[in-house]
Amino acid sequence: MAKKESFFKGVKSEMEKTSWPTKEELFKYTIIVVSTVIFFLVFFYALDIGINALKQLFLG
């Protein structure tokens, strides 16, 4: 039982040391992540279309 209490006290201690982002930083980071995901979505979609077009060109 003492091990569990010690573990959770350690977790609480470490969580208090953590620096959490402000609302502004969180919003900024969220925009960056969503923009990056959309960029790669469009990139790989265009790549897929291009590969399929080349395949159709060569294979008929």
Curated annotation (Swiss-Prot):
Pfam families: SecE
Membrane topology note: Single-pass membrane protein
GO molecular function, one term: protein transmembrane transporter activity
GO cellular component, one term: plasma membrane
Subcellular location: Cell membrane
Keywords: Cell membrane, Membrane, Protein transport, Translocation, Transmembrane, Transmembrane helix, Transport
Spans through the membrane: 31-51
Domain of life, per lineage: Bacteria
Single biological process term from Gene Ontology: protein transport by the Sec complex
Main function: Essential subunit of the Sec protein translocation channel SecYEG. Clamps together the 2 halves of SecY. May contact the channel plug during translocation.
PANTHER family: PROTEIN TRANSLOCASE SUBUNIT SECE
Family: Belongs to the SecE/SEC61-gamma family.
Assembly and binders: Component of the Sec protein translocase complex. Heterotrimer consisting of SecY, SecE and SecG subunits. The heterotrimers can form oligomers, although 1 heterotrimer is thought to be able to translocate proteins. Interacts with the ribosome. Interacts with SecDF, and other proteins may be involved. Interacts with SecA.
Protein's name in the database: Protein translocase subunit SecE
Lineage of source species: Bacteria, Bacillati, Bacillota, Bacilli, Bacillales
This protein's encoding gene: secE
